Amino acid sequence: EQVAVRMIHAAGMVGLEDHIRFSPGFVPAARAALDSGAPILCDARMVSEGITRPRLPAGNAVVCTLQDAGVPELAAKMGNTRSAAALERWRPHLAGAVVAIGNAPTALFHLLNMLEDPACPRPAAIIGCPVGFVGAMESKDALWADQPGSRAQTPSHFRRARPDSPGQLAPPPIRYFRWLRSP
């Protein structure tokens, strides 16, 4: 409940409460990770700047690798966005971390692709709230469908606005999507 209240306060939207989903065990897993000093990995500086550091229980590191040297070159090599490429820099910190995706759908897609590899370290909790009209719904659906364990998100059917006009944004190239496995 406290998490939802903080989300409502941050967004300034009282009606947000009906549009938040938590997996069973999300809050205890995230709390335990934070209490143990786990880092918080953020996809964008805007997300990291929104974290009130004095409230962190163990002086947790807040990590955003988007501006790191070499990320633009890695993105070009990967054929993906800087947001997705920056997540590759998370690997040494990912085990037991709290992940906060609050900007780029491509970052959430890339995280899910990384987690398909059994050798990839697993975070303790994933918060998936990417924004925008291109890929945000699909990335949240993929998080909810494919990641057992602890996660929270604003669901894919919730948007503050809709691009219903002709000339709305086209879907992203297929390389940004993580297609769900066949049943």
Each language-model region and where it sits:
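Short, basic, glycine/proline-bearing loop/turn elements
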Residues: A10-D18, P72-E73, A125
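Flexible, charged surface loops at secondary-structure boundaries
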Residues: A32-S36, W90-A95, A119-P121
